[in-house]
C-alpha cells in the first residue's frame, strides 16, 4: 500500500494522507465537520471539496522547488450584501465574517473568528457572484 501511495504521488496524483489532511484543514478553516475531500474525477493533481452532496470547489496541487502547496477555489453565487449570511448558513458557522479590504473594492476577506481564510473576489461588474481563493501551504497541513 505504501508503494501505491508513493507511485500515485510520483504520477502527480494526491495521496490518501494528503486528502485527509486537506479535509481536516478545510473543516478547521470553515468550522464545519461535514466538508469532505476526494480525488478529482477528471484531474489527477487535484481534489474536489464537497459539503454533503453539494460541490464546494476544487483544490489544485502545485510543487515548486520541492515544496508542495495547494490552491482552493470556491464559487459563491450571491451578492455582497448576502455573502456573510450565505456562508454562515452553508457552513453552519456564525463565526464566519466577510470584511472589507483597505483600498480594495473588488474583493473582501473571509475570516473564521480571528483566523483569515482567504480573499473573495468579485466575478462580474454587477457583483452578483464571488470566488473564494485560498492558498494552502504544506506547513498549514503539519498540525492537522
Language model features: what each stretch is:
Residues 2-144:
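Terminal leader/tail segments of proteins
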Amino acid at each position: 500500500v505504501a508503494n501505491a501511495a508513493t507511485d500515485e504521488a510520483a504520477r502527480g496524483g494526491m495521496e490518501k494522507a494528503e486528502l485527509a489532511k486537506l479535509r481536516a484543514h478545510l473543516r478547521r478553516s470553515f468550522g464545519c465537520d461535514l466538508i469532505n475531500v476526494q480525488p478529482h474525477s477528471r484531474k489527477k493533481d487535484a481534489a474536489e471539496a464537497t459539503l454533503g452532496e453539494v460541490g464546494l470547489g476544487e483544490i489544485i496541487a502545485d510543487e515548486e522547488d520541492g515544496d508542495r502547496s495547494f490552491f482552493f477555489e470556491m464559487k459563491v453565487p450571491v451578492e455582497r450584501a448576502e455573502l456573510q449570511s450565505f456562508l454562515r448558513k452553508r457552513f453552519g458557522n456564525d463565526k464566519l465574517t466577510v470584511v472589507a479590504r483597505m483600498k480594495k473594492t473588488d474583493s473582501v476577506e473571509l475570516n473564521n473568528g480571528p483566523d483569515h481564510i482567504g480573499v473573495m473576489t468579485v466575478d462580474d461588474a454587477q457583483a452578483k457572484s464571488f470566488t473564494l481563493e485560498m492558498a494552502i501551504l504544506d506547513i498549514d497541513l503539519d498540525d492537522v
